[in-house]
Amino acid sequence: MSDKFQSIKGFYDILPADTALWQRIEDSARQVLSQYGYRNIRLPIVEPTELFIRGVGEHTDIVEKEMYSWEDKLNGDRLTLRPEGTAGCVRAVVEHSLTYNGPQRLWYMGPMFRHENVQKGRQRQFHQIGAEAFGYTGPDVDAEQISMLARLWRELGVANEVELQLNTIGDASERAQYRQVLIRYFEQHESLLDDDAKRRLYANPLRILDSKNPAMQTMIEAAPKLLDSLGEESRAHFDGVTRQLDQLGIKWTLNTRLVRGLDYYNRTVFEWVTNKLGSQGTIAGGGRYDSLVQSLGGKETPACGFGIGLERVFLLMRECGIEAFHSPDVYLVNVGDAANKAALPIAEALRDSGLSVSLHAGGGSFKSQMKKADQSGAQYALILGDDEIAANEVCLKPLRENGEQRRMSLSQAIEALHT
């Protein structure tokens, strides 16, 4: 038996070859969120289990089948690794009275955990960026959040590979009415329902609309539409969202089967999808949740938010041939005792000027060090030998373009590297 440990199924390492592209996604998201006035909030990954039962929904797949939960050995509390970010963010808003002085725009980033079947684009530990806006009643913030995501896709170079799907699921009373309509319809076609749909029939019939079972698609397509059960106020809200998206030139498709997998949503729901990732094509999704804050102990507070699946955005960018690389500006080659002693102070001087430097360590011939300099991806090699040290000079050699190796003072080299 091997003594070597391996990561747990569904929990994986993000290796240095991939982190440059991850950081590009994260940095672009931070920049866009800041442009829209969202502030960062950092939340724990462990929350009370009851938070998700009440917040996400007792009869959702997340709560019924996918959460990592346990009992605290010290006090018997039921705890859960967060399966999504909205409920925890709402808990923090309520606990710290963050909306006392007015509306809040918050964002967070980090790992989430669900015990799901592992496949491409679906892991048991996955990463999300989420944004939540509290205290905004009209359709403006719904449209603005969608616009914010459209801007992010442009920044990342994938705007032409994603499609916005949009729906409205009305308010609680309209959904309750529609729920009964759906139950009656599916009862008439119960022989066509699979086991999962039969389980959902009376607990959460709207989720049947989201089934991917090919044998049920014709029946689902013919099901009554929630739009037919909407009141005037919900229709006006949805019209306001779509009108603003049209004004912004953001294309959208009405998907009347889009309901999202969490019970807290009302009115606007949306997903950004791509056809490049197979069955895991949703890269972001969200909507409005006007009753969640109150249901988790706060005052009645309108809210809207979304989550971005970072693994799927990463995979989409790779599918599109988009890469990012971390390469130093300079690789510092040093050969000889005097050069070796001077190398670290010189590397620090280069870094003080704002340059990134990979300092060769561990000795080696000039030829082997130059080979490593080339492999590092650096634009330049800064070469130190005992002769250069004696003359108080360095050699600067371009690595990515034709150019002569030049001998100069360190200050001249720093100036040249910044031009």
Curated annotation (Swiss-Prot):
Location relative to the cell: Cytoplasm
Gene3D superfamilies: Anticodon-binding domain, Bira Bifunctional Protein, Domain 2
Signal peptide: none
PANTHER family, per the entry: HISTIDINE--TRNA LIGASE, MITOCHONDRIAL-RELATED (PTHR43707:SF1), HISTIDYL-TRNA SYNTHETASE (PTHR43707)
An example molecular function term from Gene Ontology annotations: ATP binding
Protein known as: Histidine--tRNA ligase
One matching Pfam family: HGTP_anticodon
NCBIfam families according to UniProt: hisS (TIGR00442)
Domain of life: Bacteria
Gene: hisS
One Gene Ontology CC term in the entry: cytoplasm
Keywords: Aminoacyl-tRNA synthetase, ATP-binding, Cytoplasm, Ligase, Nucleotide-binding, Protein biosynthesis
